[in-house]
Amino acid sequence: MSHTAADGAAIVAAAKKSERIVQIGSQRTSSALLAKAKQVYDSGAIGELLSVELSLGRNDPTGAWEYPPPPGLAPENFDWDTWLGTAPKKPFDPITYARWRCWKEYGTGVAGDLMVHLVSGMMFVAGINQAPSRAFATGGIVRWKDGRNMPDLHYAIFEYGQVPVYVRLTLGTETAEMTRLMGPKGLLEIRERDFTYISQRGIDVAPSYYDQGFPTAMRHTYETDWHKEHDPAPGKGFVSDAMVYTGPSYDDLAPHMWNFLEAVRTRKPVVQDAVFGHHAAAACHMANQAYFRKSLVTWDESTSTIRG
């Protein structure tokens, strides 16, 4: 959505002032799979949200944005100055044009390319529409040492209220896209084509192993009393619920576009307006700022600025 947090705030203000329909393009919010996972989450299946883990990895040149520039691209057929816009001026370079995500002067790295999809999907499922209050990040350029200045390994930890959200992104090892939402009543694990829910009871199912240090008589008394108090009646024992949902092959980009067109026609709300998109992008900007500053950063909602 934006190259900086200030860009995002300007888009939000422009959308509000113009009263135009604006749909931000992170298409996870139009995913049928995530909509089904949201139903499970909203049912209270995992209980209070305690923590979230998000991860994704690539391991190929194209995935690391080493795109080939168009053959014959030259200043004679390409308006380089207009393409640069407000970015620092530099001589025409077809590599910079093709691989713009690699440099902070033009792009936002793995955070803006990949993290935003994970974060917006998590926000959609969990019903979050705010930027994280704090963020810390680490990583580095460890695989693709091609002159880029954006990290190809980027780890971040966010705080959404009391909920920590851990994000792992790498361009050096292929790993499946994964979202884990964890609560005291269960785990909801969302992958690219399916999700799994497994319930948890959150109680001891046997006497504590700590009693191994008790004298024999005390241990016997403790274990006898424990079983009297906790053992279920016959046929009443806890059975963990499990659910695996596999959706059909599904492209969430087309319905995301359709949702926008329907909103233009009917004036109904879109699934991802400028405010939601700005909040998702803010997390990515915070991850980048924390990485480059090597320090904790915070979000000031009143001014839409990153501090640290």
Regions found by a protein language model. Name each.
Residues 1-30, 44, 294:
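Beta-strand-loop-alpha-helix segment that lines the small-molecule cofactor/substrate pocket
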Residues 13-20, 36-50, 68-74:
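Basic phosphate/pyrophosphate-binding loop/patch that engages nucleotide-derived ligands
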Residues 20, 64-67, 99-108, 241-242:
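Flexible glycine/proline-enriched surface loops and loop-helix/loop-strand junctions
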Residues 24-26, 70, 105-112, 140-145, ...:
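Active-site rim elements
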Residues 54-97, 199-231:
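Core domains of carbohydrate- and sulfate-ester-processing enzymes
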Residues 81-164, 171-174, 275:
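Rossmann-like dinucleotide-binding domain that binds NAD(P)(H)
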Residues 146, 157-251:
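NAD(P)-dinucleotide binding in Rossmann-like oxidoreductases
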Residues 149, 226-232, 237-250, 254-255, ...:
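C-terminal helix-rich "cap/oligomerization" subdomain common to oxidoreductases
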